[in-house]
Amino acid sequence: YYWYFSGVLTPRFCDDVIAYANEQKEVMARTGGYGDRKLNKQEVLDLKRKRNSDLVWLNDTWIYKELHPYVHKANRNAGWNFDWERSESCQFTKYKLNQYYDWHCDSWDKPYDRKDPNNPEHGRIRKLSMTCQLTDGSEYKGGELEFDFRNYDPHMRDESKHRVQCKEILPKGSIIVFPSFVWHRVKPVTAGTRYSLVVWHLGK
């Protein structure tokens, strides 16, 4: 259910992304139900029970140019052959001490319904998700990426029996690609900082 490339991105590329993103304004990570509106204190607390991290949105050609060949290769080699057309903005994510993202999947039951029908995301759905490891696994502790390949929230039943920890992408510059409907999580970081770059790829 996933395809990985170990250490394929150069350390310079990873460091350039980190440096560039750290110059931008970071925001608190949200889940889909909260939108862009200002949250009250209770909503922030509720959100952080599910997801606690900081992120920066990036939309730069030099990043996509580096990553897209691996998406195409994974899509072909894994035999998924999803028909995807475009990528959303890249999500540069910082997981600092005790930060995490609990079980979730990246796609919804219905395609995006944007107010502007000319929005390139309108009528499209997330088909493939990609995570790029920008820091080496030796630079932090915790922060493990785990999967549950069943088609429902792992909290609902026998979570411990079905989770699969992805150790193949611990080297810096590694990439993992998987269908966006697959449930996954990032466990709490217990030391250091984990930097990653997440991109979703859309199609009809």
Where are these regions (language model features)?
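Fe(II)/2-oxoglutarate oxygenase catalytic core
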Residues: 1-177, 181-204
